[in-house]
UniProtKB/Swiss-Prot annotation:
Protein name (database record): GPI-anchored wall transfer protein 1
Protein's job: Probable acetyltransferase, which acetylates the inositol ring of phosphatidylinositol during biosynthesis of GPI-anchor. Acetylation during GPI-anchor biosynthesis is not essential for the subsequent mannosylation and is usually removed soon after the attachment of GPIs to proteins.
Keyword Lyase: no
Cytoplasmic side: 41-54, 98-128, 179-199, 253-257, 323-356, 412-435, 482-490
Membrane topology: Multi-pass membrane protein
Record-listed E.C. numbers: 2.3.-.-
Length: 490
């Protein structure tokens, strides 16, 4: 048993990752499938309402296509994108020429804002973005244990970029976007919860995740399950990181009334990077030190937590200009529900440029981060490190998510999707509705599969069939819960 455990640990150890260009190409399949689904939906060929045909198409696009992108077609992402997009585009053209009916929301038509008062809206492109990320994450956490999953996509040892490294940061970034909804809701209701109430809510939400993290630790240590110590440490894991984020950020909340969250995120990143770079002793400790005490044993989880705090804060900042139904005053960098028109008499040029629509905000911040990240990649003495969540890593994660969100937002603009004309594939909607629970289910299922078979010795065909069955299981559970209106909050 110990020999097999060692083989499995060696299978995911000492890896160097791949290029950012390839990662972008492979993960772009999620955006391409969203575009393809919209093409089919607007072609007048897809059956209306919920049908078995529609669900099969949905599952094929949003689960099978993503599975193919990181297994069989891992080396041919552009070919896979073409094979998916081209038939859907032809179906769209054919449907437009042969159908006499017109869609209720003609694409390319801009819709006027009906509601004047600030409201939080459910945006199709955010659901699609987060759903695609959750599905890809769920697939990858099991696929990484099979030879069919390229080693360059698995988490790197220390320096480098990989698909799974990006997935961890993207999960935190998207959670930041989701958490900004509560901040905007309190602001719109003119509610100011006390520090103690915020701390209690953070403990309540984080406590469940901490319990799951400790439960995972117990099973890993007692069931001879493979572990990668340099990932987070001896006792630490991703659930523990997620559990501590709400509580730690509760202590930052009072400061955010005077200082924007993006400024705090910049401060955290700069101070942390200074600690890493000021002399060699810090990095030597992180890479080479013995694991002879709790702090040293879990140094990756403890130090990288600072980087994840920064990513989470940038996710919150992004939510401020994405989630509302209209531009609000200075929403580019702070939570706001104040109407720009109402404040126009005393607003300045700065107010004009920082009160933005979702697409404008994404374009502005994407451009800023793209320029800064390229400069840092060029002149920084060290490469990206998910292990330490250093500055290059946080910049990479934030830039990627902003750029891809821009792509999703543009897709909605082109196809006329909005909160009034909400069109999102059921697979994406359902996994969003119970995201954290399904992430936990995916982790548990991954453990069960690993204990029931020797994944590293599986043939390509067997690997793919097992992964397809796993995808079907998670997808069916998610849709079942969604149709029954069962929403499990952890």
């Amino acid at each position: 048993m110990s020999t097999l455990k060692q083989r499995k640990e060696d299978f995911v150890t000492g890896l160097n990752g791949g290029s950012i260009t390839e990662i972008n190409a492979v993960t772009s399949i999620a955006l391409v499938t969203y575009i393809s689904w919209n093409l089919l939906k607007n072609s007048n060929l897809m059956p209306p309402g919920i049908s078995s045909v529609q669900y099969i198409i949905d599952f094929a696009l949003n689960w099978v296509a993503l599975l193919l992108s990181i297994t069989i077609y891992a080396s041919e992402p552009y070919l896979l994108n073409t094979l998916i997009l081209l038939p859907c585009l032809l179906a769209f053209i054919y449907g437009k020429f042969t159908s006499s009916s017109k869609p209720s929301n003609p694409i390319y038509n801009k819709k006027k804002m009906i509601t004047q008062r600030f409201q939080l809206e459910k945006k199709p492109y955010i659901t699609a973005y987060r759903g695609g990320m959750l599905i890809l994450t769920a697939i990858a956490i099991l696929a990484v244990d099979f030879p069919i999953f390229p080693r360059r996509f698995a988490k790197v040892e220390t320096w480098g970029t990989s698909l799974m490294d990006l997935g961890v940061g993207s999960f935190v970034f998207s959670n930041g976007i989701v958490s900004s909804r509560a901040l905007l809701k309190n602001l719109s209701l003119k509610s100011k919860p006390s520090f103690l109430k915020n701390a209690f809510n953070a403990l309540k939400s984080g406590g469940t995740l901490l319990f799951l993290g400790l439960l995972r630790l117990f099973f890993v240590k007692n069931l001879e399950y493979q572990e990668h110590v340099t990932e987070y440490g001896v006792h630490w894991n991703f659930f523990i990181t997620l559990s501590l984020l709400p509580l730690v950020l509760t202590f930052i909340d009072p400061v955010t009334r005077m200082v924007p969250r993006c400024s705090i995120a910049i401060f955290i990143s700069c101070i942390y990077e200074w600690l890493l770079l000021k002399d060699d002793r810090t990095l030597n400790f992180l890479i080479l030190a013995d694991r002879n005490c709790f702090f040293s044993a879990n140094r990756e989880g403890i130090f990288s937590f600072l980087g994840y705090c920064s990513i989470f804060l940038w996710g919150q900042n992004t939510g401020f200009y994405l989630l509302g139904n209209k531009p609000t005053l200075n929403n580019l960098y702070k939570p706001s529900t104040q109407d720009v028109v109402a404040a126009s008499k005393k607003s300045s040029t700065w107010d004009y440029w920082t009160s933005v629509t979702p697409l404008s905000g994404l374009c502005i911040w994407s451009t800023i981060f793209l320029v800064i990240s390229q400069l840092v990649f060029q002149y920084h003495p060290y490469s990206v490190s998910r292990r330490f969540a250093n500055l290059p890593y946080t910049l990479w994660v934030i830039t990627y998510n902003l750029l891809f969100l821009t792509g999703y937002c543009l897709t909605d603009k082109i196809f006329g999707n909005s909160s009034e004309y909400y069109k999102v594939a059921e697979c994406l909607e359902s996994i969003n509705s119970n995201g954290l629970f399904l992430f936990l289910l995916a982790n548990v299922s991954t453990g069960l599969v690993n204990m029931s078979m020797v994944t590293i010795d599986s043939s390509p065909l067997k690997s793919f069939l097992v992964l397809l069955a796993y995808c079907s299981f998670i997808a069916v559970i998610s849709v079942f819960l969604y149709r029954k209106r069962i929403f499990i909050k952890l």
